[in-house]
């Protein structure tokens, strides 16, 4: 496995794949070809670009004016992307369905790396890398991953997805009551039903960026409005910050000005990791733990920009320390700060609508080394 050489199937390999510790690099498929896939494209009334109906794909016209010539199905303007994708599924008879939005450009051969994964019958969905706008939340990077709530790649955008038809039917498709976040909800329900979902950046597609900052703000705020509904449907899955008790205490102490206790906690917990990993050199385990502390700090800064900024902003009115926190969070990623703040605006709108604080509550795990006492 370490040398990226072929390995025989085994229970250990299955456990590692299931945990997302390793990722498959399958040979090009011998089971499925592009003829086993039907492309479904919702053409929304407000789409910034359009596709040519009649190019072999199933095109769902959602309230276009004038109507899209050659569309397979027409829906009223009140429909959304979830309803359009579900309608497209009703006329598909292939084993796989590729849902591709109208503002996404694909390249020749983009399906081949994705279809190779479907040789594994446990695979329900695979998504390509979506490139386009710099620092876009749609671009999830160059590393393959298992998609699972709370993991490194906890979601994939619905801009381009290839889904096994049987998996789609088992979970009932997309939830048409969700105007935003229906793609995240769909992937999480597939995972909860036992289907593996994978992110495969060996395949890339291009997503047309929004044309103005105003459109980008509206787009990101729209994404944010889905957070409350998703947090209620999938408790704990949308926590803005995840940490263990030692790391959380160290950062809270530092922000409170208690530099000494923060340093002792961070260094002490890093040193304590060594005896728990006897096969790893102490220096390596120490560096690993310290990197974990630093990574948690970056994630906390991202949470300030994205969902905690109203709280930090109020605190900054009366506290110099809160003002420093706000400045540090913005400087940590200056480029994404405007769209992060727009996303947070949407999150708070959704929280008000659904009357819940769930999207801004962090998840702090048990203190490392401590196990719950049996009842």
Where do the PLM segments sit?
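Glycine-rich, basic loop-to-helix element that forms the pyrophosphate-binding segment
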Residues: 75-92, 147-155, 159
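A short, conserved alpha-helix in the catalytic core of glycosyltransferases
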Residues: 16, 159-163, 167-172, 177-204
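Short aromatic/hydrophobic "clamp" motif used to bind/position activated sugar donors
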Residues: 97
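N-proximal low-complexity "stem/linker" segments adjacent to membrane-targeting elements
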Residues: 1-54
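Conserved donor NDP-sugar-binding/catalytic core segment of glycosyltransferases
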Residues: 108-138, 208
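A recurrent flexible, glycine/aromatic-enriched loop bordering the glycosyltransferase active site
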Residues: 132-133, 145-166, 179
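The conserved acidic donor/metal-binding loop of glycosyltransferases
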Residues: 101-105
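Active-site-adjacent helix/loop segment of glycosyltransferases
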Residues: 200-201, 206-265, 274-355, 362
């Amino acid at each position: 496995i370490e040398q990226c050489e072929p390995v025989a199937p085994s229970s250990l390999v299955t456990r590692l794949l299931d945990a997302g510790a390793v990722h498959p690099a399958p040979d090009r498929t011998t089971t499925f070809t592009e003829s086993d896939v039907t492309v479904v494209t919702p053409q929304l009334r407000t789409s910034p670009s359009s596709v040519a109906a009649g190019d072999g794909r199933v095109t769902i016209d959602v309230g276009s004016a004038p109507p899209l010539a050659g569309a397979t199905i027409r829906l009223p303007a009140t429909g959304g992307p979830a309803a359009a994708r579900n309608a497209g599924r009703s006329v598909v008879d292939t084993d796989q369905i590729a849902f591709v939005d109208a503002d996404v450009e694909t390249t020749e051969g983009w399906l081949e790396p994705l279809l190779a994964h479907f040789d594994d019958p446990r695979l329900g969905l695979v998504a390509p890398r979506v490139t386009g706008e710099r620092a876009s939340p749609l671009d999830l990077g160059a590393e393959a991953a298992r998609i699972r709530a709370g993991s490194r790649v906890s979601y994939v955008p619905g801009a381009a997805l290839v889904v096994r038809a049987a998996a789609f039917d088992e979970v009932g498709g997309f939830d048409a009551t969700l105007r935003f976040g229906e793609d995240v909800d769909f992937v999480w329900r597939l995972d909860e039903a036992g289907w593996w979902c994978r992110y495969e950046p060996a395949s890339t597609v291009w997503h047309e960026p929004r044309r103005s900052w105003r459109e980008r703000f509206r787009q990101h705020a729209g994404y944010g409005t889905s957070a409350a509904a998703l947090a209620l449907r999938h408790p704990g899955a949308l926590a803005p910050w995840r940490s263990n008790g030692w790391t959380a205490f160290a950062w809270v102490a530092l922000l409170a000005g208690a530099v000494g206790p923060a340093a002792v906690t961070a260094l002490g917990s890093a040193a304590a990791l060594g005896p728990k990993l006897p096969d790893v050199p102490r220096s390596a385990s120490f560096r690993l733990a310290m990197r974990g502390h630093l990574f948690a700090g970056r994630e906390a800064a991202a949470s300030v920009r994205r969902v905690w900024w109203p709280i930090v902003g109020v605190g900054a009115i009366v506290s110099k320390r809160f003002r420093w926190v706000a400045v540090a969070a913005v400087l940590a990623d200056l480029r994404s700060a405007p769209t992060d703040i727009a996303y947070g605006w949407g999150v708070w709108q959704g929280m008000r609508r659904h009357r819940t604080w769930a999207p801004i509550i962090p998840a702090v795990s048990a203190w490392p080394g401590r196990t719950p006492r049996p009842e």
